[in-house]
Amino acid sequence: MKKITKTLSLGFILFLLSSAPFSLNAEIKLPVIFSDNMVLQQQTDAAIWGWANPNTPVRVTTSWDRKSYTAKSDGEGRWKLKVKTPAAGYTPYTITISDGKSVTLQNILIGEIW
């Protein structure tokens, strides 16, 4: 019984470590829900979050209004901010997230999310 418990504990710890967002090169990391071809809720303050180096300024720029939003990552590298979204439409947009290195999400649509 102890061997099974140790094996399950070790497997769980390895799973947690492999799913944690580690970065050695100052690159923005985003949860899998943020990607190319996503849809954001129209006319709201949409939350965007991720990981960067600890205590680093992060800038998010949206193409629909060319506005930049800023946040600072905490001591563990986590950051979060909200962006205003426009009315629904068929125009694809981009979101660029940067902490010195940029990540651009493309083909973002705005609409109703149920």
Please state what every model-predicted region is.
Residues N25-P54, I108-W114:
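Non-catalytic, glycine-rich low-complexity segments
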